[in-house]
Swiss-Prot record:
Membrane-protein topology: Single-pass type IV membrane protein
Post-translational modification: Phosphorylated by CK2. Phosphorylation at Ser-188 by DAPK1 significantly decreases its interaction with STXBP1.
Name the UniProt record assigns to this protein: Syntaxin-1A
Family: Belongs to the syntaxin family.
InterPro entries per the UniProt record, alphabetical: SNARE, Syntaxin, Syntaxin/epimorphin_CS, Syntaxin_N, T_SNARE_dom
Residues covered by region (Disordered): 1-20
Source species of the chain: Bos taurus
Occurrences of domain t-SNARE coiled-coil homology (ranges): 192-254
Lineage: Eukaryota, Metazoa, Chordata, Craniata, Vertebrata
Amino acid sequence: MKDRTQELRTAKDSDDDDDVTVTVDRDRFMDEFFEQVEEIRGFIDKISENVEEVKRKHSAILASPNPDEKTKEELEELMSDIKKTANKVRSKLKSIEQSIEQEEGLNRSSADLRIRKTQHSTLSRKFVEVMSEYNATQSDYRERCKGRIQRQLEITGRTTTSEELEDMLESGNPAIFASGIIMDSSISKQALSEIETRHSEIIKLENSIRELHDMFMDMAMLVESQGEMIDRIEYNVEHSVDYVERAVSDTKKAVKYQSKARRKKIMIVICCVVLGIVIASTFGGIFG
């Protein structure tokens, strides 16, 4: 009969090599994934920092009736940088999302896939939070610019309601603000100059908001659909932490009780030894 031991051993070694290759490939894939996660997190942090800088520029521009061009250019650069970085983040998150959907379509389920889904959900939520802050910052700045325009119109003797001013802004025509204003004083001219400056800022803002609107809504809807899953994960994590803390507490109590019991046993043994010595001495004295 032919001995197939060597053949079987070779086949087993080949299977082992395949398993090692798969494991190494999977580990390399996850390493690359986590590098991508860190890159995305860095981009989101950069957006957050730029948003804070945008707030400072807004305050500087509003503090001056005629802000210098350098400050306005720096603000535009910040807004442009936020837009570019946000598009990068969106593209990378979309890529991860598609990869996850492909694996789910093949009915694959693994710890690695769950990790990737959790990371993707966390990053998506963080991204939307940062962009929401940026959107709120822009909206607040628009309202402040609008308020300044209204005050300057009042200086020229022209009173407008909030609704009327909104209609004027939506017209996109700067000349509409000069209508009915008598340009007979330097105050009126200065007021009109600031009105035109603020109106220009509002137009830029609205263009920026419009450009980011579709991306923002897309990511917001994604996060909303993931919300329930994220809440469930957070609930499980919190309860796992509580369980671990209780387990540690119970372990400490057990060690404490065990230590007390051990000390009691030692005391009993010592008492028995002392009692034995006393009895032995007593009987020794009697029979001595």
